[in-house]
């Protein structure tokens, strides 16, 4: 299996293995998801987020590869939970691939039924960008995490986290962005992580500065940095359910508390207190029911600590892993006393159609990304926050796999950037085509009552129609591949979400498709929030001449 792991890497350059650049882009991004620089456990096809996979099994992976190599420019490949199940003739402007991952009928939409199907080889968990083949490593969530802490700093600390201490946990593919996001905002952070390999990966990619297994050493480093007003990120090896209570008992002053452990998956994602990783693995294999019970009890204890910090004056927020829900199910009635990050910090951006816009250079040449960085500044010369982000990303972000970039852009801006990238491909300034996509966490693509759609103004938190409409409109608009998933971020039964990717290959046809997709996709966010009664979304719809039939 080690040999297989080493062999998975996206091709670079302009030589094609497939019959067209769209198919080639899909193949390269599928492989990029499993690049050892990118994936958490590539030998098991796991990309990030507990058991978020790129393909159902190795046979399915190789079948997908073969299908993409033979897929014609007027055909569409269908992928059901990581397994290729059909190829049909469609037309050149249709998506080359349509994917559905871990979608269960609501009455059966829980982890127990999912695991039954998974054991039978009938389903896989796609997370968000794992099964939709547009994961780019921790950078993929970095700016969203950075923007969250930046908005928190604006609301509570005068615009900077300098001199503050943040406590969090979880340094996996998503949580790994937290340390760098805090230090980019000039703060100090202690991030608790039970798996030392994950810590080492974050330090190796420069997302985290230091590591220790000693609470005393972590606190000493943190205090020194705070007093000096210097940013510092510290990974503390330990279990959050234990460490947080130790810090409480010692009376340590924490300014900000959040969490990004894989609490969405109690069986695979969260390690119960009192167990080493090896002991946890054995317990998981031998008595999974006991494991889940102990993990949920630890999560309850973890949330109790977060609530206690809140009582002591810390700013506490949930970072979308559903840990509050688990704690409430375990009998902690006030588990939702602290808010989720979307209603607290991100929703105003969603109302303007802003969200995570990412792209990857299929050439494999970092110079292509640096040229697009310059392009961003050329297109948006007055957006100083965007310029600052690009400068920091160039300085601090290590590319994982194919060189890539992410930034948050709004309605109109995404189309402008996409068409400009396509022009650079056409003129040869970029050495090969570029894929343009996003996280499923976006303004108009998710229904997730404990995360993206928490506390909607009109009470429409659980309405899943919007995520379905997003997938449908991106298919109609001509995205290169479109995905619809269940359970990403917060686990089975708690979310529905859609993703899209479009390929800028320099052609006039790509111009047409990019213009449609990069308009309708963020436009979904505006109409979704306008429909829910958000005044800013209504204003933006009017400003941008977006037709919302029943909107006054």
From Swiss-Prot:
Assigned GO CC terms: cytoplasm
Entry EC no(s): 4.2.1.49
Biological process according to GO: L-histidine catabolic process; L-histidine catabolic process to glutamate and formamide; L-histidine catabolic process to glutamate and formate
Record SUPFAM superfamilies: Urocanase (SSF111326)
Top-level taxon of origin: Bacteria
Entry keyword Lyase: yes
Gene Ontology MF annotations: urocanate hydratase activity
Subcellular location: Cytoplasm
Entry keywords, A to Z: Cytoplasm, Histidine metabolism, Lyase, NAD
Chief location bin: cytoplasm
Active site: 407
Cofactor dependency: NAD(+)
Positions bound to NAD(+): 49-50, 127, 173-175, 193, 198, 239-240, 260-264, 270-271, 319, 489
Cofactor details (free text): Binds 1 NAD(+) per subunit.
Pfam families referenced in this protein's UniProt entry, alphabetically: Urocanase, Urocanase_C, Urocanase_N
Pathway of action: Amino-acid degradation; L-histidine degradation into L-glutamate; N-formimidoyl-L-glutamate from L-histidine: step 2/3
Subunit structure: Composed of at least two subunits.
Family: Belongs to the urocanase family.
Role noted for this protein: Catalyzes the conversion of urocanate to 4-imidazolone-5-propionate.
Protein name: Urocanate hydratase
Organism encoding this protein: Bacillus subtilis (strain 168)
């Amino acid at each position: 299996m080690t040999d297989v792991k080493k062999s998975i890497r996206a091709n670079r350059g302009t030589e094609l293995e497939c019959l067209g650049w769209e198919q080639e882009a899909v193949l390269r991004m599928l492989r990029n998801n499993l690049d050892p620089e990118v994936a958490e456990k590539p030998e098991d096809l796991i990309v990030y987020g507990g058991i978020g996979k790129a393909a159902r099994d190795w046979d399915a992976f190789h079948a997908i590869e073969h299908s993409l190599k033979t897929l014609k420019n007027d055909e569409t490949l269908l992928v059901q939970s990581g397994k290729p199940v059909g190829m049909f003739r469609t037309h050149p402007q249709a998506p080359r691939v349509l994917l559905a991952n871990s979608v269960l009928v609501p009455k059966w939409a829980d982890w127990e039924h999912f695991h039954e199907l998974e054991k039978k080889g009938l389903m896989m968990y796609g997370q968000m960008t794992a099964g939709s083949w547009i994961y780019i490593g921790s950078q993929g969530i970095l700016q969203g995490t950075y923007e969250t802490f930046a908005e928190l700093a604006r609301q509570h600390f005068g615009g900077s986290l300098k001199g503050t201490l943040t406590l969090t946990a979880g340094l996996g593919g998503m949580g790994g962005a937290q340390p760098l996001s805090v230090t980019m905002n000039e703060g100090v952070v202690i991030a608790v992580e039970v798996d030392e390999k994950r810590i080492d990966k974050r330090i190796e990619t420069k997302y985290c500065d230091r590591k220790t297994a000693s609470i005393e050493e972590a606190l000493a480093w943190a205090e020194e940095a705070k007093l000096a007003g210097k940013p510092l990120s510290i990974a503390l090896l330990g279990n959050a359910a234990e460490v947080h209570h130790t810090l409480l008992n010692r009376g340590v002053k924490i300014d900000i508390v959040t969490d990004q452990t894989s609490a969405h998956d109690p069986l695979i994602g969260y390690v119960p207190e009192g167990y080493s990783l090896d002991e946890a693995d054995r317990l998981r294999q031998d008595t999974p029911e006991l494991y889940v019970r102990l993990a949920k009890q630890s999560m309850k204890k973890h949330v109790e600590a977060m609530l206690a910090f809140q009582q002591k004056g810390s700013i506490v927020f949930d970072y979308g892993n559903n840990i509050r829900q688990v704690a409430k199910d375990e009998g902690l009635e006030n588990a939702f006393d602290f808010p989720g990050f979307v209603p607290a910090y991100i929703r105003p951006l969603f109302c303007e159609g802003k969200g995570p816009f990412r792209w990857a250079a299929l050439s494999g040449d970092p110079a292509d990304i640096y040229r697009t960085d310059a392009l961003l500044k050329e297109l948006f010369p007055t957006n100083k926050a965007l310029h600052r982000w690009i400068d920091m990303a160039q300085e601090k972000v290590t590319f994982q796999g194919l060189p890539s970039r992410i930034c948050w852009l709004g309605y109109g801006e995404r189309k402008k950037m996409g068409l400009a990238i396509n022009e650079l491909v056409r003129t040869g300034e970029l050495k090969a085509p570029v894929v343009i996509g996003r996280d499923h966490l976006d303004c108009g693509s998710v229904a997730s009552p404990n995360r993206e759609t928490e506390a909607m103004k009109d009470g429409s938190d659980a309405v899943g129609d919007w995520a379905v409409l997003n997938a449908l409109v991106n298919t109609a608009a001509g995205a290169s591949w479109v995905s619809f998933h269940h359970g990403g971020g917060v686990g089975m039964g708690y979310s529905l979400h859609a993703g899209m990717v479009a390929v800028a290959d320099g052609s006039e046809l790509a111009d047409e498709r990019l213009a449609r997709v990069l308009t309708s996709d963020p436009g979904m966010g505006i109409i979704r929030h306008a429909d829910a009664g958000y005044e800013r979304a209504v204003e933006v719809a009017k400003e941008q001449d977006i037709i919302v039939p029943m909107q006054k």
